[in-house]
Amino acid sequence: NGSGTSTILGVAKAAAAAKAKGMGSKRSILFMLVSGEEKGLLGSKYYVNHPLFPLENAVANINVDMVGRIDQKYTGNPNYVYVIGADRLSTELHKINEAANDKYSNLILDYTYNDENDPNRFYYRSDHYNFAKKGIPAVFFFNGTHADYHMISDTVEKINFEKMEKIGRLIFHTVWELANRDKRIEVDVTAGE
């Protein structure tokens, strides 16, 4: 997940730069990279069971996994990202992400994989899910699968860096809004709704 990792590091760098200019966020932001996803979400599972900070203090989890490629559905149009889970626990998280997109990125936010009936079940297959199981609102940003998915042929020269930057901008502004709101977002959706 080089594209997701790089994007997270870019968002962290932007947050640190804002803080250095005296414009830091109201809330702390924990940037975390975990491993073991393909073996059963092991890194995130370990963290939620052994957190460095009390989980009740977590406002949201933002998961960035594979955001630099283009899937078959969007061949010729890299201006999209699949958004999964933002509305599963908090309607506010969903609205914040959409508002950030409208203002800063103008991407197509595709909710295909957010559908409970989607056979891929991506919502349950990436690291945000361990946080969601603990009642922490989560959103997963994803570019979809491609011919090199889980292959050694998935190499850096195939990354669309302009697309990745736009997604990173969306993620930064979503995170920044979450970290600077007067009140925490509310968990207002129950499982199965």
Predicted regions located by residue number:
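Sec-exported extracytoplasmic/periplasmic mature domains
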Residues: 10-20, 49-53, 98-106, 132-136, ...
